[in-house]
């Protein structure tokens, strides 16, 4: 819960910052925060410390998914951007399903702390790739609004019905996805008696469905 709160609220700050100073600097800072948060979780000795570092981790983790959309918008025309965003949506839809599978595999060879060490390592790799990324928002296209002026635009978005309909659609998907992720182990293993070693296979079937539907959506767009 702490991670999701930090993940959602921090985007409201990183968005205006990236519009003002470009994409690469916020992306670099975000990945550094993610790495520090992951190491903090891996070295925690109490649940309070884990929650704190998970929130800290989320402050950086949100930057990648958010700025990837902005960088696509910067780099492509409307039609191609829509197709590319559809591909990105497929990746982001599969991630919440694939994550528990990978985490479960890591737990078979180590403790829960190994998961966070792996996350820190992946963060280091991603940080290295930033040096090969071009800056997609040139200086001439950057906003000169103050942060508080940008925040005022959020209220305008909340009053826009078309925008809110899309928000509700995405919200409905993630509510259902996380409800399934948290509740399916009990239903499969406890209620239906599915052996634990087969649960991962059943859980992985969702990835196939999400991939096929997202690929279809990309063609329709």
Placement of each model-derived feature along the sequence:
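Juxtamembrane intracellular "pre-TM" segments in multi-pass secondary transporters
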Residues: 136-167
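Transmembrane alpha-helices of Major Facilitator/SLC transporters
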Residues: 199-221
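Extracytoplasmic gate region of multi-pass secondary transporters
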Residues: 162-203
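Conserved MFS/SLC helix-loop-helix module at the cytosolic interface between two early adjacent transmembrane helices
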Residues: 8-48
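Interfacial helix-cap and linker-helix signal at transmembrane-aqueous boundaries
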Residues: 17-18, 102-110, 188-189, 220-221
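Helix-loop-helix hairpin linking two adjacent transmembrane segments in secondary transporters
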Residues: 49, 78, 86-131
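Residue-level signature of mid-helix packing/kink "hotspots" within the transmembrane helices
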Residues: 4-12, 96-97, 207-211, 215
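Cytoplasmic helix-loop-helix junction between adjacent transmembrane helices
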Residues: 47, 53-94
């Amino acid at each position: 819960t702490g991670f999701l709160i930090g993940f959602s609220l921090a985007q409201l700050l990183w968005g205006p910052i990236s519009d003002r100073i470009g994409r690469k600097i916020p992306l670099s800072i975000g990945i550094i925060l993610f790495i520090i948060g992951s190491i903090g979780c891996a070295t925690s000795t109490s649940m309070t410390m884990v929650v704190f570092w998970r929130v800290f981790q989320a402050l950086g983790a949100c930057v990648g998914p958010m700025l990837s959309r902005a960088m696509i918008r910067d780099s492509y025309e409307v039609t191609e951007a829509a197709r590319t965003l559809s591909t990105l949506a497929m990746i982001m839809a599969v991630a919440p399903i694939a994550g528990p599978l990978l985490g479960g595999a890591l737990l078979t060879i180590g403790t829960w702390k190994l998961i966070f060490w792996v996350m820190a390592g992946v963060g280091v790799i991603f940080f290295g790739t930033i040096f090969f990324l071009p800056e997609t928002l040139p200086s001439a296209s950057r906003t000169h609004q103050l942060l508080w002026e940008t925040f005022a635009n959020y209220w305008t978005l909340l009053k826009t019905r078309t925008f809110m309909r899309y928000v509700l659609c995405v919200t409905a998907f993630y509510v259902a996805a996380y409800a399934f992720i948290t509740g399916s182990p009990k239903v499969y293993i406890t209620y239906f008696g599915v052996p634990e070693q087969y649960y991962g296979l059943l859980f992985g079937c969702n990835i196939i469905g999400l991939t096929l539907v997202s690929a279809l959506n990309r063609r329709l767009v």
